[in-house]
Amino acid sequence: MIGALARKLFGSSNDRRVKGYQSRVNAINALEPELAKLTDEQLKARTTEFKQQLADGKTLDDLLVPAFATVREASKRTLGQRHFDVQLIGGMVLHEGDIAEMKTGEGKTLVATLAVYLNALAGKGVHVVTVNDYLARRDAGWMSQIYGFLGLTTGVIVHGLDDAERKAAYACDITYGTNNEYGFDYLRDNMKYRLEEMVQRGHFFAIVDEVDSILIDEARTPLIISGPLDDRSDFYNTIDTFVPKLDKTDYEVDEKQRTVTLTEAGMEKIETLLRDAGQLKGESLYDVENVSVVHHINQALRAHTLFTRDKDYIVRDGEVVIIDEFTGRMMPGRRYSEGLHQALEAKEHQPVQPENQTLASITFQNYFRMYEKLAGMTGTAATEADELFDIYKLEVVEIPTNLPVARLDEDDEVYRTQQEKYAAILAEIERANSRLQPVLVGTASIEKSEVLAAYLKQHGYKQIDFGSERALDKLYAAARAGKPAKLFAVLNARFHEQEAYIVAEAGVPGAITIATNMAGRGTDIKLGGSLEMRIQQETAGITDEAEKAAKIEQIKADIARFREIVLKAEETVEIEPAKGSKPAKTVTKPGGLYIIGSERHESRRIDNQLRGRSGRQGDPGRSKFFLSLEDDLMRIFGSDRLDSMLTRLGLKEGEAIIHPWINKALEKAQQKVEARNFDIRKNLLKFDNVQNDQRKVIFDQRVELMQDESVVETITDMRHAFIDDLVSKHVPEHAYAEQWDVAGLKDELKRVLDLDLPVDAWAKEEGIADEELLKRIETHADERMAAKVAQWGPDVMRYVEKTILLQTLDHLWREHLIMLDHLRQVIGLRGYGQRDPLQEYKSEAFTLFEAMIAHLREAVTAQLMRVEIVPPEEQQQTLPPMQAHHADPNTGEDEMAFANVSLVPSSGAAPVPAEARNPKDPTTWGKVGRNEDCPCGSGKKYKHCHGRYA
């Protein structure tokens, strides 16, 4: 109560922060008349002036007012749009590195230009992050008009670009792209072998659009670049045949935790099936040698019990394609890891693709925390403000709307069964359609959207075929005639190619659009329809300019008329009075876009996003959720008690219960789920931070190695450290000579370093100590390496040293990632022994990391001590492109092997001597200096011709 009173008297902290920006808004407004007088060239020249002022010592904060005023003026001249005062405030929040929460239709894309331009003046590159390629292209194409007018360059990163195109896009002042592409480019860059092949140029400032979707909804799924392992499709198919043979008593499913475990009876049955199939090693399922079999049994169980076709994935063209649970979009190319995707393929009797090995991975949480400054925009972040601050140190600032929100949010209607709920939704759609009010129905899955579509078809509605040209002509004609068209559109993962078009036209009179969750997010729904979309669709084939202009005028008139129809599509409802009270009264519910939610999502934020599609820029609108006790949220979180209560109240079939208490109870259930999901994400981050710290060490070290002209000092240090470890192991400090393992040391030197040294004779010398032994071994090893440098030349050896070091580091890092994954899967069991799994994981991960570094020293030293360089037997005409080897960023590898150099042990073939050289036969060339003319006769230096990869 005291807090509420204080907020009423002094305003909330958010109100005070917003008011704090007003003085700068006034200063920007004061500059407007002055800038309006400038010519285009004078306005453009201000960019150069700002850059000079930065060079002279001014800060970006010092330039905020004049820079924002300049962007506003440029926007007026290029786009015909002027930033509102509240949009200026949004730009300031972004510049300060926080999250601007702005309602749908408030112009977030335009707001971003303010902070983007200001920060781009620093010359370090600004990244604007969107959720899909369409939005990246659209926003870059649209906003580059402002940036280009002011002399800044704009690039776009989308799927399918090669490295040269990516590098050019990142070199621009401003780069638009998707969160996936930025993350994968970072991972691929850290798999390259030369600095000039890297495409990104740092992480200075990023603005994340739909920040809640990217930093929260996708935080649990890491970006993974992987490569295929051996084909085990027969094994997966065999395991899959076992699951249908199990009864429900053989396993226990926990839907809340998304886990499934075998019971004692189930284990015995599986053991018998495995034994009969010849897949069981030893006596018991839980013998050590059967660990991977147990893992795959569990994955097959999960595939059959926890994953539903058309909800969690779809089957398309012989492939199992994941569906994003938050957006309902297909995610082609992305695959579940650790055998789960293969289990789904076996379940659906599709070709089982090879399992993948993780080559590199990072979570969005850790990728975006690398930026010096991070900001975000969204329409719904307030409910997750604590998490955004806790993990990313981002404060959420609610920006006031330019016009008050005029949407009516009605109480939920709760029915007993899903069938009753769908019948009520259908009746509501028919009432709205009869008065030409456009309806957007939100569903939680493809399966639910298609159930609704089937209901509509049964009642005489036809689905719009967006594969045909002018798909909406019948809808437009019916709207002009003032009649319902009885047509509907479905927007889900199956039809995401037409996503923007379907969403943009969801505001046409009589339109019925069924959309999974938040599909189409980022595209505004304008009442009456989208002018840009219709012009694009309806003038595509018109070449005559006069005819085109006339068509555009007709479309404009159409949309203006349609908008009026939608605004007038109000509903007058008669409310029956209670017994003994006054006569019935009527209530008018607004027109505009009508949002119908077919069930509540686990997160309040997703529900708010759906509501937020209506009521943009002060337009009227309404929203209502229809629920049933059979919905997932209701079923998992206590529908049994509610069902018995409704029975006692005498609720009849087809009747709904509507009360604010129900809304509050649901909100509490959602808060519990949100809190649980936050804890899961937070816990995952704690574990991922362990790997992230190690990743940073390895990636930073790789970049340093690539920057160095020569890694000879590093190689020498590694060799000496390995020899030191070897001597310490076999000749411990302060041990007596009789305790030395001289024979073991001699064998190890021969095995690893290929050095046959008289260690046994040295050990018998009077007064010899471990330090003297160490020094002699190091000297002999150094002499062996010096001889190789003398034989092959310093240029060749420097290249070989760097390549072997980087390749070995990459190989061991990948093996280390597998070890960490396995450790993470089993570490939770330590909790049963009263030990903290996180602390245990940290300790063991560090031990594994130290072991990897020791192994690196040994492996690199061993390879270099034995390496011989053999020129190729014949010239390679073509070479594989040095880029990631995967169709989609989720399953790719960026690995470079020797093209024209073979590394063989010294026991193999000897080097080819330099004889009389035949220009057409590279095998006769012998050793060629990198700066010599190429023996092929091209006239180029060897290093620029056949020696490029030697």
Swiss-Prot record:
One of its GO terms (cellular component) is cytosol. Part of the Sec protein translocase complex. Interacts with the SecYEG preprotein conducting channel. Has a central role in coupling the hydrolysis of ATP to the transfer of proteins into and across the cell membrane, serving both as a receptor for the preprotein-SecB complex and as an ATP-driven molecular motor driving the stepwise translocation of polypeptide chains across the membrane. The lineage of its organism: Bacteria, Pseudomonadati, Pseudomonadota, Alphaproteobacteria, Hyphomicrobiales. It catalyses: ATP + H2O + cellular proteinSide 1 = ADP + phosphate + cellular proteinSide 2. Transmembrane segments: none annotated. It is a peripheral membrane protein. Residues 873-892, 908-932 are annotated as: Disordered. It comes from the Bacteria. Its EC number is 7.4.2.8. This is Protein translocase subunit SecA. The gene is secA.
